[in-house]
Amino acid sequence: MAAVDVSYRIEGRGPALYLVHGIGSRKTTWDEIIDGLKDRFTCVSYDLRGHGDSPIPPTPYSLEDLIDDLEALRQKLGHDRVHIAGHSLGGMIGPAYARAYPRHTLSVGLLSTAAGRSEDDRAKLQAVGNAMEQNGIAETLGTFVARWFTDAFIAAYPDQIEARLQQVRDTPADVFLGVFWIYATTEMAPWLHEVKCPCLVLTGEFDGGCNPRLNEFIHGELPDSRLVILEGLKHSLMIEASDRVLPHLREFLLEQDTD
């Protein structure tokens, strides 16, 4: 499938940092992170194909399609070498891009993503996908909330929970299911060792699907990485705790050679 001319936004100045959101999300999920980085980095956030303001080509999509979209955007904007940070599915797109285009990749942030899944991990994802296909995405939204956010955040910020759920509702069902299956079936274990650039691996202590065990595996497979586990958090780190993600991401990025 041909690359899609995705909707994007650029803020800041300095070395280019491309920010890649996850399933059923939007480029706006990075807003608070961008506010803390745009003094030193040219922050490029974009909507994945089929999401937000980007075109909606016919499904199914593949991980390679999503990599092609990122490469097309890099070429369009003319950045030779870029940092990439991705969340969840975006945390798979980033290292996969770095593997395909090592010359153009300065570093990768893998936030709340997964590799080295066990048979039980894969079975749980299969069950979630099957439930969405059989019962509809709307019927599973309640289970997503419990996976994505802590109980305290759910109680304190119902408007933010509803806004995130509305993003899911506004994503075409075939797109949401399609990118879920990309996330569920992608296994980075066979090739993570090929990603040679510096990497930040970060997740929440209580993220069920992208848990510390899986991120410790990622950290161990990458030749040059650091691991951060944020205590008490689940999956939606940028919504619930961008103030805790930002210092680690900023420190990591500033330490890289940006010449």
Predicted regions: what they are:
Residues M1-Y18, K38-T42, H79, R226, ...:
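Alpha/beta-hydrolase fold catalytic core
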Residues S7-T59:
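Conserved HGGG/HGGXW glycine-rich cap/lid loop of the alpha/beta-hydrolase fold
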Residues E64-R81:
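Conserved acidic catalytic loop of the alpha/beta-hydrolase fold
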Residues P95-A100, H104-E139:
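Flexible "cap/lid" loop of the alpha/beta hydrolase fold
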Residues G116-A123, N135-E194:
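Conserved alpha/beta-hydrolase catalytic His-Asp/Glu region
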Residues V195, V201-T203:
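Short beta-strand/loop motif that positions the catalytic acidic residue
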Residues E205-C210:
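Acidic catalytic loop of the alpha/beta-hydrolase fold
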Residues L233-S242, L246:
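Catalytic histidine-centered segment of alpha/beta-hydrolase-like enzymes
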